[in-house]
């Protein structure tokens, strides 16, 4: 029997569905769902974990022996080696908490114990006992084991912990790793046809991060709480991520509190190129507005003086007309951070964005959404992805245009990793296939992918300087001349701000100004 270990139950279901010749048989082992199916006559079983099934914790106490030095003592009485700096006092101690005759108790929140807690051994304790029991039951009978957790640092650690549980009951079964970035039949089939060894270094990196979280969080949380409340009252939590984030928020809040608002005045003029002098109705395509060249007047008297100068004026002279084209490069592929930023601009919060993205990934619509990479790997068949989503009527014509234009070339971001590709669509979806919120995010991802394969956009900017009774006004407009990638990716695109045709030296109607 081949045992396949996944990170979540949904993944166990999906892999069984994609690999099994027939519909998998749902079963339970000690109340944990498992899925049985055959592959070429061999029985396979998939089991989903619940993320981490082991969690780190300090040993409850430390003891010191003159010949052996320091060691941590687990709840079961097992001694784990410990390395403490020579600067820390050693027994014999007076028996006053947290000290014992030959060591230090670490469970209680005592200030004196914190210097020792930093160096205490860390053990892994069962977090999901029922799942561990089920996993071991299956592992006993397994001829081979495939770890199919997410292929990233955290997934490798989760898989490594699961494997350690399996090894407690089966030390001989061959172990391999399935790496995949999407729940599609080609991707999963390829992953299981090209199994690789476990990446112990990647798992160790995940373990180091988790240990640092524990050391930082446990020691500093206790310290801050004890300093503030002498052991009483609310806990003052600290963490590797939350504390620096809090510092950023505090710094920004201090800037906000220190900000002294200043009054300013803005003057806007109304113009009409359809006449040489006003007043006119100020409507239609020839009408436009322009602010004073001094965008913000800091002195009220100066703003009033400018308003006095233009009071009664009915005409403005076009002093200059400047036109300049600029190229806007297509965007780079989505990683997690840029996806959350783009989704936030569309009204989807980061937390909701990741919930939806995880759901789309599990349903086979997008690739793995927790990535740093912004460079598509050479192994990704871009044309195949374009063809896969071309069935959506909203993208079909654009997809066909891309494919007919020649070899596809994608933009490249600054971050290139080898674990997962950037986020891209893996299957066609329409509004009929998904909920409104899910499709909104899918649509963003699909259009972004197509945009990364597209050419730049060209925008023509126009700047017109006008003179009204000696006061300068400046009108600006932008027009999308060559849509390029903007034809498929309209996000963040400003509406064309078209100015009427104006020539230097011409007179246009001035219909007054507001301040």
Residue ranges, per PLM feature:
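Helical mechanochemical/support elements of P-loop NTPase systems and associated helical scaffolds
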Residues: 11, 127-138, 154-162, 184-188, ...
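Active-site phosphate-binding and catalytic loops of NTP-dependent enzymes
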Residues: 23-28, 174, 197-202, 222-226, ...
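Short glycine-centered, acidic/aromatic-flanked micro-motifs in structured strand/loop junctions
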Residues: 149-151, 341-343, 370
